UniProtKB/Swiss-Prot annotation:
The keyword Transferase does not apply. Disulfide bonds: none annotated. It comes from the Bacteria. This is Putative RNA-binding protein RbpF. It comes from Nostoc sp. (strain PCC 7120 / SAG 25.82 / UTEX 2576).
Length: 105
């Protein structure tokens, strides 16, 4: 299981997150997703702790806490397949308004 950490500063590093979560136990892994096109951090992370008890303690201790000027959103990460059935998944971005780059005149 892993923990979802949202509303992060775009300046945060894996080391910053590891240090905060280390207060609640051993941090096995920190993943900071970046935007595919810009390479910029997306403002959330996933943290994997050494045990379920450590993850629960971290969630209870950090959810809603202010860190780096932001109120953290910390909860159990949902498995990818359950993340929502809003259709399309990662296929979006090409249809609709995507064809306006070339002028015919």
């Amino acid at each position: 299981m892993s923990i979802y950490v949202g509303n992060l500063s775009y300046e945060v590093t894996q080391e910053d997150i590891s240090n905060v979560f280390a207060e609640y136990g051993s941090v096995k892994r920190v993943v900071l997703p970046t935007d595919r096109e810009t390479g910029r951090l997306r403002g959330f992370a996933f943290v994997e702790m050494g045990s379920d008890a450590e993850e629960t303690a971290a969630i209870e201790g950090l959810d809603g806490a202010e860190w780096m000027g932001r109120d953290l959103k910390v909860n159990k990460a949902k498995p990818k397949e359950d993340r929502g059935s809003f259709g399309g998944g990662n296929r979006g971005g090409y249809g609709g308004g995507g064809g306006g780059g070339r002028s015919r005149y």
